[in-house]
Amino acid sequence: MDTVNPTRPRNVACAIAGLIAVLVVFHAAGALAELKQEGAGIVKSVVDGDTLILTDGREIRLVGIQAPKLPLGRRGFKAWPLAGEAKQALEKLTLGKRLTLSFGGRRMDRHGRWLAHLHTKSRLWVQGALLKEGMARVYSFADNRAVIAEMLALERESRAAKRGIWGNDFYQVLKAEKIDRRRRGFQIVEGRVLKVAPTRRRTYLNFGRDWKRDFTIVIEARSRRAFPERGARLKKLEGKRVRVRGWLRWRNGPMLTATHPEQIEVLGK
């Protein structure tokens, strides 16, 4: 007769956690090379899944990721799924610990929060660990694009394994040809670019024949300079399958604005 070993699940979980830590440290080695280390601090408290406060009063927004959001006093705001778990994950990684701050772009946001990458004494990359555990998504800006490739790789692995948020429909990757009109906010969308239409003021990446109904990526003229050859190579995306992330809005059909190339991943033909 087979017997059940009650310690096995715990051992397996510990082994998986250990493997994740090793992989994140490996990714951190490459990430550190691209970032400028400057300062350190001890974590006093955690605000939510991507924000914490140091003992010296500095508020740190973990740049490059977006964790599920908590209301944080906002009237009528409903917590996103797994927001509490994401906060707990960040607490487990950082609370009471001394962290090194590293920067790869703009250093402070309009709220006065420091936009930093964080590493523990053992060189564990905090952003990488959260992505690996499925407790955050990659969330980049035109003025903060460092180590995005490394973060996207960790996110892809986590999504494929359906860890954390990737097992919840709220965070599912949307299909460009079938976006529910109730969808709003920060989204990830996949589909095939049918046509690239550059104009003087902006470039449109159309995913269907009817621009009044179908999904479109918009790149403003001022943002084209961030793309290879000032946007001239965008034409090569025609016929390609891509994954794009950003804030979804509805203007005629569903629309998403891209300000930098890291928002658009080319998946193939």
Predicted regions and their residues:
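Small beta-barrel nucleic-acid-binding modules, primarily SNase/OB-fold domains
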Residues: 2-18, 23-269
